[in-house]
Regions:
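Intrinsic low-complexity, intrinsically disordered or marginally ordered coil/linker segments
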Residues: 1-136
Length: 136
């Protein structure tokens, strides 16, 4: 279910993808103790070698203010798990994003690349985003 308007999940960007080719993870994030809402987020970050590196950086991001604190000052504890992963190629000159392959670490996830492409179309509306389950 989509997060409520006042949910701290709304502070977490859905799609963060750097230029060039990177391994990516698709992760589900929720606020600890609140199973009624969750979001899917994509991370393909510069300087990461492995899918797990992207997940580790996402976990660091979730602990950093202001995402870890509500407007009332109450601390949030975010919980995340990897749904799947693959590769993303972002070409800023051509304004294209390609999602493909799978993660050997986290396994093949049916629909993962398609869901990732949907998230990236919203995050990067000026880019043409395509997906495929081909490749590694």
């Amino acid at each position: 279910r989509e997060p409520r308007d006042d949910s701290p999940l709304r502070l977490i960007p859905r799609g963060v993808v750097y230029s060039l080719v990177w391994k990516y993870v698709l992760a589900q994030v929720r606020v600890e103790g609140r199973d009624d809402e969750a979001i899917l987020v994509v991370r393909a970050l510069r300087g990461t070698t492995w899918h797990a590196d992207n997940f580790a950086r996402l976990r660091e991001e979730m602990r950093a203010p202001p995402r870890s604190t509500t407007t009332t000052g109450k601390e949030n504890a975010f919980v995340a798990f990897v749904v799947g992963g693959g590769r993303i190629e972002r070409d800023d000159e051509a304004k294209t994003i390609s999602v493909y392959g799978y993660s050997k670490t986290f396994g093949r996830c049916p629909g993962c690349n398609e869901r990732t492409a949907i998230i990236l179309r919203e995050a990067f509306p000026e880019y043409e985003t395509t997906w495929s389950d081909d490749g590694y």
